[in-house]
């Protein structure tokens, strides 16, 4: 019995030390773990005894904040349509923001006639009931909204659940995987596509060298380095892999060798595919599991073995490292 208590004590001590070393606040870890900051504070101060399952959850979530982790996950684009014209309700009750602090403009995009914005958080509306209210968060908008969620002691999961309960229709969800150590080699993946060492639901791919014109749909196409698209850009599921370090070099002047993120792998989902991804997120509360299950379902890179059928070719080692369980170690 004493051994179990000691083990639990060590777990809590290690949790607290790692959290502080990672520069993560109690509030941020608590939100990620689905508990309140007050509850986590009581656990760390030994005033509350957590269950084994909760301790495991806390350690698992804390591991995602490890600044030395080779891969990290984030939401990079969110577009949701709400079947209502009550924009104040969406802003107050779903986003939980104050409309009085938002900028109102008498124009919009996507044929909407007006919009409210707070930084890069945009909410569009019009008099057309069929169009309803549209929320759009691009990359910077997602990062800004995360700060508000943290202040609200909510997670992305809480927000998405609120949106679905209110009848929100998922129009687009992008999940981004940041490669901090160069696990992926984009030119190598492009060459494997050319050599047909790529198995996927779609054979379509496009590869652009640095500086080449990328489809107009990219907001920062002039900054993106070598870029590989897997799948048709017109489909409801496709992937975009590009050199994030090059983007930061061109935009901010950050030397390539000092870039925090080397490559970015984006999973872009629309309509029904976006809805099913959100449903999976709200089933497992594990964005990493959802992201890699989608990747594994749609694409894998292999090494040619002439004496075997293509479906039996060996998984490419670098790709296996990227999608495998050992990527966290």
What are the language-model segments listed below?
Residues 2-3, 8, 21, 65-328:
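Structured, helix-rich domain cores that form ligand/interaction pockets
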Residues 34-50:
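Recognition helix of helix-turn-helix/homeodomain-like DNA-binding domains
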Residues 51-67:
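DNA major-groove recognition helix of helix-turn-helix/homeodomain DNA-binding modules
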Residues 1-7, 47, 54-58:
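N-terminal flexible/basic segments that precede or flank functional cores
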Residues 26, 38, 44, 264-266:
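Acidic-residue sensor for enzyme active/binding pockets
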Residues 13-32, 57:
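Short basic helix-loop element that most often maps to the first helix and adjoining turn
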Residues 7-11, 35:
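Alpha-helix N-cap/N′ positions at the starts of helices
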């Amino acid at each position: 019995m004493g051994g179990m208590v000691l083990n639990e004590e060590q777990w809590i001590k290690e949790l607290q030390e790692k959290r502080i070393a990672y520069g993560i606040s109690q509030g941020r870890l608590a939100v990620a773990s689905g508990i309140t900051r007050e509850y986590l504070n009581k656990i760390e101060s030994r005033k509350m005894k957590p269950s084994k399952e909760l301790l495991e959850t806390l350690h698992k979530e804390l591991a995602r904040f490890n600044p030395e982790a080779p891969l990290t996950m984030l939401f990079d684009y969110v577009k949701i349509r709400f079947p209502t014209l009550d924009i104040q309700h969406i802003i107050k009750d779903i986003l939980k923001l104050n409309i009085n602090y938002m900028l109102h403009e008498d124009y919009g995009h996507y044929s909407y006639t007006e919009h409210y914005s707070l930084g890069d958080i945009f909410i569009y509306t019009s008099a057309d009931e069929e169009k309803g209210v549209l929320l759009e968060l691009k990359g910077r908008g997602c990062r800004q909204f995360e700060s508000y969620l943290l202040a609200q002691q909510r997670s992305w999961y809480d927000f998405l659940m609120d949106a679905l309960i209110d009848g929100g229709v998922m129009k687009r969800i992008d999940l981004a995987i940041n490669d901090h150590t160069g696990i992926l080699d984009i030119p190598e993946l492009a060459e494997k596509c050319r050599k047909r060492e790529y198995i996927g639901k779609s054979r379509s791919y496009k590869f652009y060298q640095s500086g080449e014109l990328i489809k107009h749909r990219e907001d920062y196409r002039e900054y993106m380095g070598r870029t590989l698209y897997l799948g048709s850009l017109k489909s409801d599921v496709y992937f975009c892999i590009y050199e994030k370090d090059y983007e930061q070099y061109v935009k901010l002047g950050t030397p390539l060798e000092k870039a925090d993120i080397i490559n970015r792998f984006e999973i872009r989902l629309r309509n029904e595919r976006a809805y099913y991804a959100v449903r999976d997120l709200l089933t497992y509360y594990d964005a990493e599991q959802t992201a890699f299950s989608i990747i594994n379902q749609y694409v894998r890179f292999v090494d040619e073995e002439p004496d075997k059928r293509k479906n039996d070719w060996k998984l490419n080692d670098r790709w296996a490292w990227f999608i495998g369980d050992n990527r966290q170690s």
